[in-house]
Amino acid sequence: TVLMVQVENEIGFLGADRDYSVPAEEAFAKPVPQKLNSEFAGISWEQLYQETAPEMFMAWHYACAVEEIASAGKEEYPLPMYVNAWLNQFPDRPGNYPSGGPIARNLSIWRIAAESIDIFAPDIYLSDFDGVCREYTAGGAPLLIPEARRDAVTASNVFPAFAIYHTLGFSPFGIEDFRADKEEEELSATDQEVLEKLQIDELAFVYNGTGRFLARSYELMDSMKKIYFQYRGTDSMHGYLQKNEHEKGTILRLAGCELELSYRKHSLSEPGCAGMIIEDSEESFFIAGCNTDIRLLPRRGSGQKHLTVLSMEEGSFENGQWRRGRMLNGDERYHKRLGSVPEILRFRYKAER
């Protein structure tokens, strides 16, 4: 079954900010197309876009070419279509990354010129996973992550991608090579040299036992499909992730309590600190994720004096129904946490006023 079509992969111009061939120079000398600039007739690319003119020029022409392909394809079979983007990063000069591709600052041009493209999808190898997702979902745009890092942090990024940004799909690069029992691998000297020239984080392409963690993340998400779609996009669903090593935690305001989530120290060979929370009632929630210490607190300003955890359960979803495993008590309930291997817990609590 074909679900959607990738029209182009990381399209753009490498090595320079734009095409300087004779035909390209002639096109660049012409005014900006009226479709892009209805307010100032006859204005040049440089007058309108100044120093970013070369990249905007390339973005327009790449997007027009993609639109020709996509619109013709949809006439034959109207499937959803997407284009994925090689993202800009330091030193952030067009040509170091593919100039004119659908990076965030070019999307306004792409959306005008390539109306048949349904999704502009970021390939996220950068460490700022949250920032990229936020840019690509601006204005309610749908998110698809066709390529992501290969290291273990990708297994934790799954949860905020679905919980916060409602991604339609998530796949690390080369997922067909991932196995739960696959050993860690190192990059060759040639690979390291190429990544260095392209200013790409070497760790993003290092497989460090990711398979067993990612398999568990996918297993949890698959088992939670029913409850996920029930609460997707509502105030009862929350997500979180540690954005950098200086961030110690976060506090989420739930319906009946505040949830203090402290980020645990972890090695580079483990997933990061991230998770998803689904409130199935005012005094009950599920939390799935990794490397997080959990503390339930009274809601400030609510008049709550004390909060009691009634139960803390391990378990799993089977056919959409929660099947309780162990009921945790004693030290396990006192030290509430998610470990390095993705897991799910259910909490029931009672607030006293």
Q: Which functions belong to the PLM regions below?
A:
Residues Q50-T52, N88-P91, A113-A114, G139-G140, ...:
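A generic short-segment signal for beta-strand/edge and adjacent turn/coil regions
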Residues N9-G12, L87-F90, L126-S127, R150-D151, ...:
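Short, solvent-exposed loop/turn segments at secondary-structure junctions
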Residues E68-P78, N106-R212:
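Catalytic-core region of carbohydrate-active enzymes that cleave or remodel glycosidic bonds
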Residues G256-M276, E282-R353:
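C-terminal beta-sandwich/jelly-roll accessory domains of carbohydrate-active enzymes
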Residues E26-K30, K35-L36, P142-L143, H166-T167, ...:
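Short, surface-exposed linear patches
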Residues P160-R295:
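Aromatic- and carboxylate-lined catalytic core of secreted/periplasmic carbohydrate-active enzymes
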Residues T1-L107:
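Polysaccharide-binding and catalytic clefts of secreted carbohydrate-active enzymes
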Residues F57-A59, P94-S99, I119-P122, G249-A255, ...:
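Short linear motifs at secondary-structure transitions and domain/linker junctions
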